[in-house]
Design a protein with these regions (language model features):
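Extreme N-terminal starter segment of soluble prokaryotic enzymes
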Residues: 1-2
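Residue-level signal for alpha-helical context at structural boundaries
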Residues: 30-32, 108, 131, 158
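Residue-level signature of transmembrane alpha-helix interfaces in integral membrane proteins
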Residues: 88-91, 108, 144, 158-160
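Conserved glycine-rich acetyl-CoA-binding loop
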Residues: 72, 96-111, 115-120, 131-138, ...
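C-terminal "cap" of GNAT-fold acetyltransferases
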Residues: 123, 130-137, 142-146, 150-174
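Acetyl-CoA-dependent GNAT
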Residues: 5-99, 110-112, 116, 172-174
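Short, charged low-complexity linear motifs
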Residues: 6-7, 121-127
Length: 174
């Protein structure tokens, strides 16, 4: 396994599909004091996927690292500073194939992007995930991230019914 910085001239615009499996989700429920989150198991495991591309045009000067086995890219992480609020956004972190997960590759990528974020002088690192991506939520929590917000209708008007609500997670650096 080797971590390498990815060249935007080579990777920009390349497409990939991110997949994950989940056994449940965190329902965001209104309550008297605001909202609460409650874990709910699905009746059967669910597989989710979405298509994306490297070095999205919406990012300002993104940096990306790949994890390679030989010449094969098996995962990557991408991030960029948000100058207006001095936060570093991790826009993607993904190990492409299920058989390569739980081998420390995601942790190696997280370590690389956290070093990049610290070097940028950012006050905080932030990222987005979904309430149904329970493995990602657990991974981010192990890395010191906490839930800092949510958007009930970020992806569609049916996100709560789809059990896929956007959550923002963050980790203070300074």
């Amino acid at each position: 396994m080797e971590i390498r910085k990815l060249d935007p001239a080579v990777y920009a615009g390349r497409k990939f599909t991110a997949r994950y499996r989940t056994n449940g989700y965190y329902a965001i429920l209104p309550c008297e004091s605001g909202f609460q989150m409650r874990y709910t198991a699905f009746e059967a495991p669910v597989e989710k996927s979405f298509d994306d591309e490297f070095f999205g045009e919406w990012l300002d000067h993104p940096v990306a690292y790949g994890v390679f086995e030989g010449d094969r890219l098996v995962g990557y992480v991408e991030g960029a500073i948000e100058g207006w609020n001095n936060r570093y956004r991790i826009s993607n972190i993904c190990i492409f194939d299920f058989e390569n997960r739980s081998r420390g590759l995601g942790q190696a990528l997280m370590n690389a992007i956290l070093r990049e974020a610290e070097a940028s002088g950012a006050r905080m690192v932030i990222l987005e995930t979904q309430t149904c991506n329970e493995n990602a939520i657990a991974f981010y929590r192990r890395n010191g991230f906490e839930i800092i917000g949510f958007d009930l209708y970020s992806y569609s008007n049916d996100d709560p019914e789809k059990c896929e609500v956007r959550i923002e997670m963050g980790k203070k650096l300074i």
